[in-house]
Amino acid sequence: MADPKFQYLPYIAHDQPDVYETPDVNEAETSDYDEDEPVNDAIERLHISTKDSIGKFRGKYLTGEVDFSDGIGRKNRLGYDARSLDYELAGEGERETPLQRCHRLKCEMNELMEEIEASRADTGRTAEEKASHETVFGVVSTAKKVLESLKLEQVIGSEVVAGGAGGGDAEAKKLIAQIEEYRKTGAVSSSDPKVVANELVQSARVAQLEHRLHQLEVAVGAKPERISRLAGTTGTGNLIEAVQNISAKAALLQPSQLDTIEQRLNNLLQQMNSIQEKSNATGQDPNREQKILELYEIAKSTEPIVQVLPDILNRMLTLESLHKYATNFSKLFAELETTQASILNGVAANKTLLTGVQEAFAQNLENVNKEVKKLEERMTKLQQMIK
């Protein structure tokens, strides 16, 4: 054995080689031929198409939140829920009929109301969350009532309900029978779809307002005595302002605010005690007391003016701006007068210069005329001499 690392190991065959080669297998023994299995009628052979299976389960996924346990609790389990009624919903890619949509909305509203009921039982919720859940529950219940009172045949027509149900013909016939019963009893009063739609919208709005009014009556009370007592306590006749006033007062009663108020009161008490000690130590000064009395009399005499004082101040501020404008106007007017005087002086000087220029021009013109006459006389003499 050439490799020394196996020299001292137990159970090693030192007289045999390290590499072992298997002999070649005959090709006749490795044929791909499969013998046909015997056909047995007791065995059911399923013909599964892979393409159809992929198309059917495309977009589906498994979730780990499904609960199939047998635990008992107030909250519904997340396993498959077997309903008492069988509703046929539209498949993937198919157009949903009005009947199927109505059933689907009812199922979704029932599930939502069950979830809200389960959240009500949760003690860890805050008051705001519970109030919001109550509001949502009221709105959903109102919408459910409106959906239950929906006259499907009257709104969309009996032909659409009967012909568009698809596989749910039995349910469509059942719904048509119920509508016929309502029609016989006089439940249907109008045949105009627009009128019925408006009535449904108005009934939903009225139901929502009634629910909100019921919540206000539960919180405040429907008796006039309680409302008048609330208005007298808060000093306002508006319910929103009264609630804001009460919430502001309730905010002051929080532990953090109480500590701050107590600290400020203690500081104020200490300051008042120190002021009282200083006044007791210094004693009473007659002159000081006399001045305080005079100031009190002055303040008392000016009490009627206090109410008019803001208007007087506003008027004085307005007059101040007016006085500023008047001062600026007077300054501008004085500058204008100065400029006008300088212009008048310049005009007078220009008149004097103009008079002198006119006199000089007249004298020069007279001299020119004399010279022209002399020149003409000489010209005539010269012409006579030439002749």
From Swiss-Prot:
Name listed for the protein in its UniProt record: Dynactin subunit 2
GO BP field: mitotic metaphase chromosome alignment; mitotic spindle organization
Taxonomic lineage: Eukaryota, Metazoa, Ecdysozoa, Arthropoda, Hexapoda
Compartmental location: Cytoplasm, Cytoskeleton; Membrane
Matches recorded under PANTHER family: DYNACTIN SUBUNIT
Keywords: Coiled coil, Cytoplasm, Cytoskeleton, Dynein, Membrane, Microtubule
Coiled coil region boundaries: 99-125, 256-282, 355-387
Membrane topology: Peripheral membrane protein
Job of this protein: Modulates cytoplasmic dynein binding to an organelle, and plays a role in prometaphase chromosome alignment and spindle organization during mitosis.
Alphabetical list of InterPro entries matching this protein: Dynamitin
Any one GO CC term of the record: microtubule
Pfam families registered for this protein in UniProt: Dynamitin
Family: Belongs to the dynactin subunit 2 family.
Quaternary state and interactors: Subunit of dynactin, a multiprotein complex associated with dynein.
